[in-house]
UniProtKB/Swiss-Prot annotation:
Coiled coil is among the record's keywords: no
This protein's name: Eukaryotic translation initiation factor 3 subunit E
Task performed by this protein: Component of the eukaryotic translation initiation factor 3 (eIF-3) complex, which is involved in protein synthesis of a specialized repertoire of mRNAs and, together with other initiation factors, stimulates binding of mRNA and methionyl-tRNAi to the 40S ribosome. The eIF-3 complex specifically targets and initiates translation of a subset of mRNAs involved in cell proliferation.
Source organism: Drosophila ananassae (Fruit fly)
Subcellular location: Cytoplasm
Family (UniProt): Belongs to the eIF-3 subunit E family.
Ranges in a coiled coil: none
Gene Ontology MF annotations: translation initiation factor activity
Pfam families for this protein: eIF3_N, PCI
Gene expressing this chain: eIF3-S6
Upper lineage: Eukaryota, Metazoa, Ecdysozoa, Arthropoda, Hexapoda
Length: 434
């Protein structure tokens, strides 16, 4: 279903190395021409120093079984440059080992003092460590690259010209080595830096747009990610504004997170508002499923869209692992919404709405009532499900109010900050005439 594939647009906001898992994932699907896809991978990998990956891709394209002279020469150059950079960093190699093993060295001042005292540390060493980290990353040696990037983060001043690049590089390397806990820490650190940095409005918007795309990789792989993606994308006005302005297609991932997160059903109301606002710029089966169900109360439409959702998710690298969960929770949403409207429902009617056989639907409803403690009874003889009232718990009411107040407070804080910056700028401009 190339119509709803977001790989092309997502790759525009990802580092070159982060696109490879997405492209390799597509190779296992039948969405695009395999030859053209492999040619694009080869074109992309040629811009890196991953010679072995380049050779492997050439073999898959049946170009050659032997390494061309050009690649042999490039590999020799890469190894020579790598050795040269490692020699430049040699004086602080032991220091990076201490940093990896010693928790006490995580304090920046302590570590820098130890470097200067014990290793005769100089500014040139920091520049060499940065260059080596970047080069290792370009070679695909992400694990080793993280050690030097971490070293740079500890030693560098946030005002250093390379500090922002190190933050982005560290996050990318942790994602590519599947270190999700560390990746989340790096994501938070980078977000805090972007939010507090003195960027222009356009620069800040661009930085947040890139961060939004990178963060999707982290959020759908971290245990706490399903809550964090909702908080960041839906309840942080600066990031919601970036989504609405630059990348409304991210609504797919926000909507998916809300559907599979049963503890955050309170976010549905706010999500539906945003989906309706952005429906003229972006729609897909996932957002349309929620519109059918919660705006139009079109259960037949929701049933058809749920079927389309399965195909979309199956072909989306970011959320493919959520497929079974999404289908289960989407059925639950249909069931809950249908039950709010009808007090007495036939099992055959529910089975039709849920794309299930009557026997399967009855077992599913029995388990649902037992596990979710829904106030309902099943009359097997008549084939009816009789619903009781399901009041909103005080906890859910409290969470809804807190989220609403938090969003309003952050919006007001952003408004005050923008007015303050504008006032300061006017004051600075007025001095130009004296």
């Amino acid at each position: 279903m190339a119509q709803f594939d977001l790989t092309r647009i997502n790759c525009q906001y990802l580092d070159r190395h982060l696109t490879f898992p997405l492209l390799e994932f597509l190779c296992g699907k039948e969405i695009y021409n395999q030859q053209e896809l492999l040619e694009y991978i080869l074109e992309t990998v040629n811009k890196t120093n991953m010679i072995d990956y380049t050779m492997d891709t050439r073999k898959r394209l049946n170009l050659s079984q032997e390494m061309p002279e050009e690649l042999v020469q490039r590999k020799a150059e890469v190894l020579a440059t790598l050795k040269q950079l490692q020699n430049e960093v040699a004086p602080i190699m032991k220091a990076t080992d201490i940093l990896k093993n010693g928790e006490s060295m995580k304090d920046s001042k302590t570590f820098v003092n130890a470097l200067q005292k014990d290793y005769n540390f100089k500014v040139e060493h920091l520049e060499s460590a940065y260059k080596l980290a970047k080069y290792l990353y370009e070679c695909g040696n992400y694990q080793e690259s993280t050690s030097y990037l971490y070293f740079c983060l500890i030693v560098m001043s946030p005002n250093d010209k390379n500090y922002l690049n190190v933050l982005w590089g560290k996050l990318a390397a942790e994602i590519l080595t599947l270190n999700w806990n560390t990746a989340l820490e790096d994501l938070t650190r980078l977000r805090d830096y972007i939010d507090s940095a003195n960027f222009s409005t356009i620069q800040a918007l661009q930085q947040r747009t890139w961060l939004i795309h990178w963060s999707v990789l982290v959020f759908f792989n971290h245990p706490k990610g399903r809550d964090l993606i909702i908080e960041m994308f839906l309840y942080k006005p600066l990031y919601l504004n970036a989504i609405q302005t630059m990348c409304p297609h991210i609504m797919r991932y926000l909507a998916t997170a809300v559907v599979i997160n049963r503890t955050r059903r309170n976010a549905l109301k706010d999500l539906i508002k945003v989906i309706q606002q952005e429906s003229y710029t972006y729609r897909d089966p996932i957002t349309e499923f929620l519109e059918c169900l919660y705006v139009n109360f079109d259960f037949e439409g929701a049933r058809l869209k749920l079927h389309e959702c399965q195909t979309v998710i199956l072909n989306d690298f970011f959320i493919v692992a959520c497929l079974n969960e999404f289908v289960e929770d989407a059925r639950l949403m249909i069931f809950e919404t249908f039950c709010r409207i009808h007090q007495c429902i036939t099992i055959s009617m529910l089975a039709d709405k849920l794309n299930m056989k009557p026997n399967e639907a009855e077992c599913w409803i029995v388990n649902l009532i037992r596990n979710a403690r829904l106030n309902a009874k099943i009359d097997s003889k008549l084939g009816h499900v009789v619903m009781g009232t399901q009041p909103l718990s005080p906890y859910q009411q409290l969470v809804e109010k807190i989220d609403s107040l938090s969003m309003r407070s952050e919006h007001l804080a952003g408004l005050i900050e923008r007015k303050s910056k504008q006032k300061n700028q006017e004051s600075i401009d007025s001095w130009k005439y004296y």
